[in-house]
Amino acid sequence: MPRRREVPKRDILPDPKFGNVEVAKFMNVLMLDGKKSVAERIVYGAFDQIEKKAGKAPIEVFSVAINNVKPVVEVKSRRVGGANYQVPVEVRPSRRLALAMRWLREAAKKRSEKSMALRLAGELLEAAEGRGGAMKKRDEVHRMAEANKAFSHFRF
């Protein structure tokens, strides 16, 4: 964290094909070693697959999937009197989006389809329907928060 002044957030340019900032952000999450063209190919390939399989607009499927996977609450560790408590806290909007994208990426990586584009398409379609690995992760985080509701008075 900087000591002098707050570092301004950089604006992300929308992606070239759909003109959507969230898609561009997701490409950045997927990107490895600065290879943006590879990330673009994966995302656009996944969108083509979504259009073939579902027959819906891929942008709509993507935004529904992202909104379904976004967590509302999570737990943070808080040390009180020699004991660590998992305290449920509300997730701020920017972190919600970041977590949703990260979980979608990880769930897609764990799938068994041949190419990453196919895996991502499958995961996005499942997340849009409320199933899949990313949704499982979101539900797990929500369950943890629900189980530790008793410690919610230890706010940060």
UniProtKB/Swiss-Prot annotation:
GO terms for molecular function: rRNA binding; structural constituent of ribosome; tRNA binding. Keywords: Ribonucleoprotein, Ribosomal protein, RNA-binding, rRNA-binding, tRNA-binding. PROSITE patterns: RIBOSOMAL_S7 (PS00052). InterPro entries: Ribosomal_uS7 (IPR000235), Ribosomal_uS7_bac/org-type (IPR005717), Ribosomal_uS7_CS (IPR020606), Ribosomal_uS7_dom (IPR023798), Ribosomal_uS7_dom_sf (IPR036823). One of its GO terms (biological process) is translation. SUPFAM superfamilies: Ribosomal protein S7 (SSF47973). One of its GO terms (cellular component) is small ribosomal subunit. The keyword Ribosomal protein applies. It holds the Pfam family Ribosomal_S7. HAMAP family: Ribosomal_uS7_B. Part of the 30S ribosomal subunit. Contacts proteins S9 and S11. One of the primary rRNA binding proteins, it binds directly to 16S rRNA where it nucleates assembly of the head domain of the 30S subunit. Is located at the subunit interface close to the decoding center, probably blocks exit of the E-site tRNA. Belongs to the universal ribosomal protein uS7 family. This is Small ribosomal subunit protein uS7.
